[in-house]
Amino acid sequence: MIMQLQEQRYYSPEEYLELEVNSEIRHEYIDGQIIPMTGGTPNHNQLALNLSGTLNFLLKRQPYRVFITDQRLWIPKRRIYTYPDVMVVQTPLEYQEGRKDTLVNPVMIAEVLSKSTKSYDRDEKFAAYRTISSFCEYILIDQYTMHVEHYCKTDNNKWIFSEYDDGDVTLNLAAVPCQVLLADIYDQVDFSVEE
């Protein structure tokens, strides 16, 4: 998603959640700041849909749930509410205390990179996600060319980085028992369309 900074007023998490319930658009909450999330491009949406649909199909009747863009995640150690493009959670779902609309236990997250958010997604957002104990896999998908960055956490809490740019390559996921062909992630994506 594309982020836009809003005025520098600081909000409590409770104020944010109250505003978010009545809002027509989604917002991220980052340690007191509320940041509107604008709509994505057709390529952005297609990539998120392709990955989530593939994962949802491959994980049927297994103890995982796949969520796309509208599912809120709370990162308590960083005081961040965010909406990952694709998020996989092992069941049972764990919710933020006192809420039934905000999850806290993803095992895998994927973000589709845009020009305005790619640095944030690679750096600050990834650092925030790494504070979640259940989180062990991160996928960054480029919407302008076939290129995927893949991070997997090892048993000794080190992260292994791999990158792929060939449609015939299979992405072997560590957090969930499945493999995804890069060509399936990029199906119907038109690189000739600019943001």
Give the label of every model feature segment.
Residues 1-195:
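Gly/Pro/Ser/Thr-rich low-complexity, intrinsically disordered segments predominantly at protein N-termini
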